[in-house]
């Protein structure tokens, strides 16, 4: 069995723009539906997910948390798919990954909602890039550490995880997965076992 190299979506394979715009668009749509312009301000909060629940309670009434999250993430998925374009793809990284496919299995491990990942990859011409897609279930709050743990139980540890320098790198290292933090989309705050600025350094 070929060893696995795992990759993140936002900040490694793709620019962060479509995810950031979808985030703002989500709050805008809900502000229209609830006729409350103040909802737009929630998009700027660090702890915005508590406001997602608040907005969903106002919109859906007294339903369970899983239903609220599922509705919220479905709307976010639709907004992200609408936003993403081929211009958001880190083309040289894709070329690098394609060169690895003969010797390695490529896994995309992302907290993006599961229903959005295949359409996003299709829109940017990467439907055939990954051997394994490991995504976040629609009804759960996105949690990358849990995804890593579940992935390792099912497939074993990747030989490397390549992602932007955020808390995902910490989770990867804590689980004994060697991490490569990349800075070609944005400068990360967390350094992996290897920290690189451009694709040519891989």
Predicted regions and their residues:
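Asp-based, Mg2+/Mn2+-dependent phosphohydrolase catalytic module
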Residues: 1-5, 118-202
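Active-site neighborhood of HAD-like aspartate-dependent phosphohydrolases
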Residues: 1-42
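Alpha-helical elements of Rossmann-like donor-binding domains used by nucleotide-donor carbohydrate transfer enzymes
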Residues: 25, 54-58, 92-95, 99, ...
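Short, acidic loop-to-helix structural element flanking the phosphoryl-transfer center
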Residues: 80-108, 118, 145
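Conserved phosphate-coupling serine/threonine residues in phosphotransfer and NTP-handling enzymes
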Residues: 110-112
